[in-house]
Amino acid sequence: MKYSKRYIAFTGVLAVALLIKFNNFGEQYQTVNRFRGAQLEEETWNPLIAQSVNEGLLSVVIDNKEYTNEKYPFFMDSNLDIMVPVSILRDALNCSAHIYNEDTLLVEKHNSELSFSLNDDMIEVNGKKEKVVSPLIKKNKEHYVSLNDLSNYLDYSYIWNIQENKAQAADVSESATIIPTKYDLRDRARVSAIRNQGTYGTCWSFAALSAMESVLLPEQNYQFSVDHMTLNNGFHLTQDDGGEYTMGMAYLASWKGPVLEKDDPYGDNKTTPDLTAVKHVQEMQIIDGKDYEKIKEAVFKYGGVQTSIYNSLKSSQSRSPYYDRRTSSYCYIGTEKPNHDVVIIGWDDSYSKDNFSVDLEGDGAFICQNSWGSEFGDGGIFYISYYDTNIGTHNVVYTGIEDSDNYDHIYQSDLCGWVGQLGYNKESIYGANVYTAESNQNLTAASFYATGKDSEYQLYVVKNFEDESSLSNMTPVASGKLSNAGYYTIPFDKQIALDAGERYAVVLFISTPDAVHPLAIEYEADDATADVVLDDGEGYVSANGFEWENVKNVENCNICIKAFSNDR
């Protein structure tokens, strides 16, 4: 069922709006008098109403989460529609929303597919033309769409509350899921180019960067350098030694990359270490093992998801009892651990079990992108059964890929990232990293790893840090809860001014259900981390936030807490 309540302007309300608009009661009173006797025309009054709404605090509540125009650029247009930025739709409406060719918006949720064209009052709803009042527009480099129109066609209720200056929308669909039973990113131009890793053990890097490229599509088309990621990541490994997803996360989180393929081409075993990242990755979510619904939602909303499988094939030309070349279908059931990374780019719940070379209980498969060139499978793509032992066990989706000018400075001491975990045999812990401001700056955000799902966090800043006793003067700057494990950058509620040379601490309290060691740390764990640098950080830990100890006295390690600032 759908509900919609439009903004109705009565004469008395309009008169009040005009009296607010026109401050003087003398000369301009005659203007009001003339309007009272005139026919109330929408083109005259609606812009005044919209202006009055936009000048105040405008609140938009979507599925019980509140947004305001203090932080997000919502506005009411001259048709009295609340226009919302397309950039928030994916998370706010829990849907797929992408801009094609700068002039077309495709929104998908449940079984609905909406296509908006720039400045066109006709949209397509599941292939059928429908007329809307407020078309898709572009303003200040951002696309905007009517929340009322989205609500009408995505099974949302919509209410405008004039007294509170608040729009409210809520999903009232009877569907239990936001995703269809079949979905393929190839049909939506959201799959990156098929590439070939050759004889090197670089599948983990191809999977990570291909997944990132998919997330950026169709709005941005990039090809990132695998050579740079595999040869400049801080780990003591060659391209023949292989790797895994946390290595890629560390490389990206530290702003070492990504860099462009054309600037550091693949396959020559050479690299250019002084290249700078063309994107800054600020968020990478780790989806729980075998949570197929969440994996599908991530593909649907964001793009390709990096995952790991056990691959019994040695090359695109080899054979295996687990792979059917006729149907490009693979399923391994056994005890072997993952040895190969691929990208999930879709799924088909009805994909027949008869397409596989092994006997299976039921239908269904993920559609996956490999890094063995277009000669493998169906142009580089193959199907992996839902019943495969390892598919969907380790999953990463790159949800926060930002422009490289998002912050002026990064402060960090954990270039190898999340190598291990530290704790006091309980769910919560305090950790703090101390840094020195390089110039006059505003501290605006911090990042850390959530080592398990449903982690709750609180972030604090300590100015003018001298020693452990300074940690009693913490200023709260952010708090929240994270649904998935992963790497997160949290903007502060307020900026903290730092002077050049000032020592400061960023403090993290984190609580992770069922954890005993919830704090991510960097340390020398094995041959791969033999080159880790541990004398570049100053960190402290506490069980209660009152008694602190230098982390070097607990474990020879660095704490994974970074800080971000802008010049002032």
Give, region by region, the residue ranges found by the protein language model:
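Primary recognition of N-terminal secretory signal peptides and signal-anchoring hydrophobic helices
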Residues: 19-181
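Surface-exposed loop/turn positions
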Residues: 141, 303, 486, 500-502
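Catalytic-core signature of thiol
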Residues: 170-444, 449-480, 517-524
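Short proline/glycine- and polar residue-rich coil/turn motifs
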Residues: 479-486, 498
